[in-house]
Amino acid sequence: MTIRTRVAPSPTGDPHLGTAYIALFNYCFAKQQGGEFVLRIEDTDQVRSTAESEQAIMDSLRWLGLEWDHGPDVGGEFGPYRQSERSDLYKKYAHQLVDDGKAFYCFATSEELDKMREEQMAEGLRPKYDGRGLNHTDDEIKANLAAGKPYVIRMKIPSEGTFKFNDYLRDEIEIPWENVDMQVLLKADGFPTYFLANVVDDHHMQISHIFRGEEWINSAPKLLKLYEDFGWEAPVLGHLPLLRNPDKSKLSKRKNPTSINYYKEMGYLPEAVLNYLGRMGWSMPDEREKFTLNEMIENFDMKRVSLGGPVFDVDKLSWLNGMWIRENLTDEQLIQRFVDWKFNGEMLAKVLPEAKARINTLSDLVDLAGHFVGGIPTYDPALLTAGKADEDVIRQALQFFVWQLEGLRSFDKPAIFAIAKEVATFHELKIKDFLEPIFVAITGKTSSTSVLDAMEILGSDLSRARLRVALAHLGISKKQAKNIERAYREYPSA
């Protein structure tokens, strides 16, 4: 049997460190045994999925040094590798489950389901689908279908007992069926949910082992029951520990940069980032901290993964990155890395048109536009509140601005300005007064090139990181944080 693993990210945002971590461990497991690695794109969310995000995922994984044997850009015998291109297959299998009595139609509207949940919560019950679709007679189902009434297809779940399964990395896990919902398999728009699409794809692509994050443990009964319902052999299933912040909280972009692109833009070496991800819950037999991808593959043993939450510490990554620079790069190689990073024609072409009208000598460019080739600028935090606006208002407005930028699909000047204008208006600030602290946070100065142009050139990850540092300079107490979160719920676009 060919060992075949996969990673299946959704192209709905920035390429995440967690995606790279899961991809790396699946990749090493397969390659250590002479197997194959598959990249599949889960783009069934047609509202949030973008081609730009898909390309960013592939670019970031390749930047790290990971390649795939099968995927949307390289093809393969199991394609297509975008779920949006396999929708007919999912519909076929969803209806097959209905015909086999393993799934059922549900015609309940979203309003009816909202009311159901409200009533359950009012009674102190955990919100859960109540199985109302199971009560439809055959005649009712035929009439609803003939009338073109919208429906979803849900899987049938036992009402009592427990489900037991063996996890590759853990002891036997037992989950009561009462904690498992009647999962929607096919949505009203005809697209599948994660559960159906993944089972169908993993079966057809002959995936032998699935290693995913531990947040999916409670969904394992649904996944494995679908294999049973189809009469297919299930792959080996294992759940890797989640990456954690130094305070042990789940790695989240609201606390620390989580995008692979951020670390690329900050000047980290891909070898060092991949090396550090390889140390997340796993170590070399000789405990050495610095190793290459090939060395990791040669020594990899998934059974040696520690289940305690591995901590992603940026300071430790920086230390390791420094080791890679000093020990692995010649002066000539380091020069080329600098050129590839920021000191190149592509970057200058972005910066010079804006700067040209404001410089008299070439050396003026360093002071005027140095923030384009730096990481996090240093400045006097007092500059953030030197304007007319109240400090508490600026603090909340900046936090709203960061949260709104997180959901921005196209990080360009018009879109950034629109959000800034909306946030300023909500806080009764003049846009000029709101842009002043943003200017300082992004450039580290009170005068330079356009801050909105700078944000577009720097990109989403680095811009948001600089804004988060500004918020840290301003300081947010636990009480203030709660008040800001409460106020954000009233924000129109929250």
Swiss-Prot record:
Enzyme Commission identifier(s): 6.1.1.17
Record protein name field: Glutamate--tRNA ligase
Catalytic function, reaction form: tRNA(Glu) + L-glutamate + ATP = L-glutamyl-tRNA(Glu) + AMP + diphosphate
GO terms classed as biological process: glutamyl-tRNA aminoacylation
Record localization: Cytoplasm
Motif 'HIGH' region per record, residues: 9-19
Role noted for this protein: Catalyzes the attachment of glutamate to tRNA(Glu) in a two-step reaction: glutamate is first activated by ATP to form Glu-AMP and then transferred to the acceptor end of tRNA(Glu).
Keyword hit for Transcription regulation: no
NCBIfam families: gltX_bact
Major site of localization recorded for this protein: cytoplasm
Cellular component terms per the entry's GO annotation: cytosol
Broad EC category: ligase
Keyword Zinc attached: no
Any one GO molecular-function label of the UniProt entry: glutamate-tRNA ligase activity
Superkingdom of source: Bacteria
One Pfam match: tRNA-synt_1c
Sequence motif 'KMSKS' region, location on chain: 250-254
The family this protein is said to belong to: Belongs to the class-I aminoacyl-tRNA synthetase family. Glutamate--tRNA ligase type 1 subfamily.
Subunit structure: Monomer.
UniProtKB keywords: Aminoacyl-tRNA synthetase, ATP-binding, Cytoplasm, Ligase, Nucleotide-binding, Protein biosynthesis
Residues that, per the record, bind ATP: K253
